[in-house]
Amino acid sequence: METKREWTTIKEYEEILFDFYNGIARITINRERYRNAFTPTTTTEMSDALYICRERPDINVVVLTGAGDTAFCAGGDMHVKGHGCYIDKDGVARLNVLDVQKQIRSIPKPVIA
């Protein structure tokens, strides 16, 4: 017998979905149209969500996923890439994906992708 999970939103973001169910935090890259390729906004939002996961004692495990069934994540979005770097909405060169990778590795909870 399969039961329907009632996920609740932890926080609203522009490019990710961040929700919770029974000790599980789920972070979904929500850019299906671009095969969930990340932008500076995506990595900033993921970093914030991972910080919340680290700090909340009711979160026991983190699941990272991508929207749709085509791709988990295609990497960096080439549409926002400038000359040699990724450009955010403010025109500043940044992507910070290594910071997010460090957070994933150092969070004291299991992370499943």
Residue ranges and their predicted role:
Residues 1-65:
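Conserved CoA-thioester-binding segment of acyl-CoA-metabolizing enzymes
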Residues 10, 66-103:
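Glycine- (often His-adjacent) and acidic-residue-rich active-site loop
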Residues 13, 56, 75, 107-108:
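Acidic-histidine catalytic/liganding microenvironments
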Residues 38-39, 76, 85, 108:
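Short, flexible helix/strand-to-coil boundary loops that buttress conserved ligand/catalytic motifs
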Residues 100-113:
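Conserved catalytic cysteine-centered active-site region
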